[in-house]
């Protein structure tokens, strides 16, 4: 029983660390979160629709909210997911800078 409790504590720590990593990654690419939990980060952006569409074309699903225009990003499932998200954010910003 004590082992299960310690596992729960470690899992919470891991989720909190992953959430901070997600917030940092989003912020590095110009999408600083306005809120979140240990499971997701919420970003308000005038470019929410365009970013959602760009990420969806790469198989990265985020939740779009209309008012205010915002996105909810869940934690990537594994390291490959983190890499895909970083690539998606980077290529979106590159594409936007060409406009």
Language-model-derived ranges and their functions:
Residues 3, 46, 77-80:
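Short coil/turn linker and secondary-structure boundary residues
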Residues 4, 37, 66:
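Short, histidine-centered active-site or binding-site loop motifs used for metal coordination
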